[in-house]
Amino acid sequence: MIRIGTRGSLLATTQAGGIRDALRAKGHEAELVIVTTAGDQSAAPVEQIGVGVFTAALREAIADDVVDVAVHSYKDLPTAADPRFVIPAIPPREDYRDALVARDGLVLGELPAGSVIGTSSPRRAAQLRALGLGLEIRPLRGNLDTRLSRVSNGDLDGVVVARAGLARIGRLDHITETLEPVQVLPAPAQGALAVECRSEATDLVAVLAELDHADTRAAVTAERALLAELEAGCTAPVGAIAEVVESIDEEGRVFDELSLRGCAAALDGSDVIRASGIGTPDRAAELGLAVARELLDLGARALIGR
């Protein structure tokens, strides 16, 4: 029996349940084990309670042999590798975009100046401020249904959350606008899951690798390499999105390229630096480093710390 560790929220158990079902479909017995994390018990803003707070307890549960596998929202994982663990599977990614859930069915451009928007993410807050719409951005915690209720009960005019999360718990009908990357660039690895286990568990690594999706792995590798090179944590005002796209060479042959867009924003919205690049999926990390270095040359490090 493969024991899959997960946080107890509806979103987390839905994500982990998808991995359990995928393993069962391939003939492997699997079950969910709920692990309580410090992040779930704190009401403080994410940037105050520490990078990787939601993932640390799951990793310790693996190390203590309470569970065999942990399913993480990949964007929550620290960029620094932990040699005790390996990620054999990054399943196909959900929609990576952010989504607005606003009162009265409004889109961003229809919200009057002074409207109060809640978000858990400094990255979203910085980019929303940079749009120059005069919105008031407030920090937001709680599970997705709690965040949505802040709009329906009139506490907030809107919230911005990951579209993937709403999709996974069946709440897409609440979205009033899906935000394109040109408006708000998503977090590195947003919409992707990381399926993690002990490095030395070679048989389990082979089983989990059956669920891996090569294009998603390439994209996430580039995005997280960019984040790591900027020496920015998962709560920093940094956005990145990579996509595998088909191209045609001069002789008419189709081949895959990897495109990457990245940005760094001042938290007050006063400036956003953008850079992009194209590489190949098998050199995803190098592409991430190259785009990060372009951002650094443009002044990203000072901007992130502003």
Swiss-Prot record:
One of its GO terms (cellular component) is cytoplasm. The gene is hemC. It catalyses: 4 porphobilinogen + H2O = hydroxymethylbilane + 4 NH4(+). Keywords: Porphyrin biosynthesis, Transferase. NCBIfam families: hemC (TIGR00212). Belongs to the HMBS family. Binds 1 dipyrromethane group covalently. InterPro entries: HemC, Porphobilin_deaminase_cofac_BS, Porphobilin_deaminase_N, Porphobilinogen_deaminase_C, Porphobilinogen_deaminase_C_sf. One of its GO terms (biological process) is protoporphyrinogen IX biosynthetic process. This is Porphobilinogen deaminase. Tetrapolymerization of the monopyrrole PBG into the hydroxymethylbilane pre-uroporphyrinogen in several discrete steps. Its cofactor is dipyrromethane. The porphobilinogen subunits are added to the dipyrromethane group. It comes from Mycobacteroides abscessus (strain ATCC 19977 / DSM 44196 / CCUG 20993 / CIP 104536 / JCM 13569 / NCTC 13031 / TMC 1543 / L948). The keyword Transferase applies.
